[in-house]
């Protein structure tokens, strides 16, 4: 799936060798400022490395068509960006960008419910809390059926009970649909409970 060799990025990351396996959940842990978010950006070619190789399916991410890569590998930031006025429009936005067929409303609502987001499709995005926007971004991305989801603290704004429910549903959906999850989390409990693999990064290096 992903393979990194001899990767260096400024003074932020220095990774000799790292692989992410397909159809697994990898949790990335470590102190703030250690390079976790930067690693996700490298995987999606949002920033360019100074040295080494980042390969996706055996091909350098820099050689992939950017649009195609980001359809296959979707990244959700800790504070996800929303593009539209209503919840329904937000869930449909990815399909309209690619001219793909938009799912039926029942499918949109079902995905929201799986992510513990019980809102009408007509609800204005601007009235959602930070945690609700995180769940909306997860639902929007899962509907697009990516090969890989890169998640940067996807549940940081949720209470513990809701966080566990959302991550459980996310993990179940990913396993059933062959989606690879690479998730940054500060919660060791989440990493140990849901991660097939755990990668710890400190000061830009794999521990």
Regions found by a protein language model. Name each.
Residues 124-128, 132:
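Conserved ABC ATPase signature
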Residues 44:
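Helix-to-loop junction immediately C-terminal to a conserved catalytic motif
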Residues 80-89:
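Conserved catalytic motifs of ABC-family nucleotide-binding domains
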Residues 52-60, 69:
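Conserved ABC transporter NBD signature motif
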Residues 149-153:
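Catalytic Walker B motif of ABC-type/P-loop ATPase nucleotide-binding domains
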Residues 160-162:
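Helix N-cap at the start of a conserved alpha-helix in ABC-type nucleotide-binding domains
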Residues 103-120:
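Conserved ABC ATPase "signature" region
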């Amino acid at each position: 799936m992903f393979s990194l060799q001899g990767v260096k990025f400024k003074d932020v990351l220095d990774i000799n060798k790292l692989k992410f396996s397909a159809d697994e959940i990898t949790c990335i842990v470590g102190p703030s400022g250690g390079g976790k978010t930067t690693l996700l950006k490298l995987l999606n070619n949002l920033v360019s490395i100074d040295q080494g190789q980042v390969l996706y399916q055996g091909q350098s991410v820099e050689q992939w068509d950017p649009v195609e890569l980001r359809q296959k590998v979707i990244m959700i930031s800790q504070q996800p960006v929303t593009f539209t006025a209503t919840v329904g429009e937000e869930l449909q936005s990815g399909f309209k960008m690619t001219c793909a067929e938009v799912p039926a409303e029942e499918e949109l609502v079902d995905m929201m419910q799986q992510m513990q987001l019980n809102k009408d499709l007509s609800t204005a995005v601007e009235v959602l809390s930070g945690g609700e926007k995180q769940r909306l971004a997860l639902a929007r991305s899962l509907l697009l059926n990516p090969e890989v989801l890169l998640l940067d603290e996807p549940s940081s704004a949720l209470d513990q009970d809701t966080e566990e429910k959302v991550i459980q549903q996310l993990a179940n959906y990913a396993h059933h649909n062959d989606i690879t999850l690479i998730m940054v989390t500060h919660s060791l409990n989440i990493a140990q409970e849901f991660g097939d693999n755990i990668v710890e990064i400190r000061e830009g290096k794999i521990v």
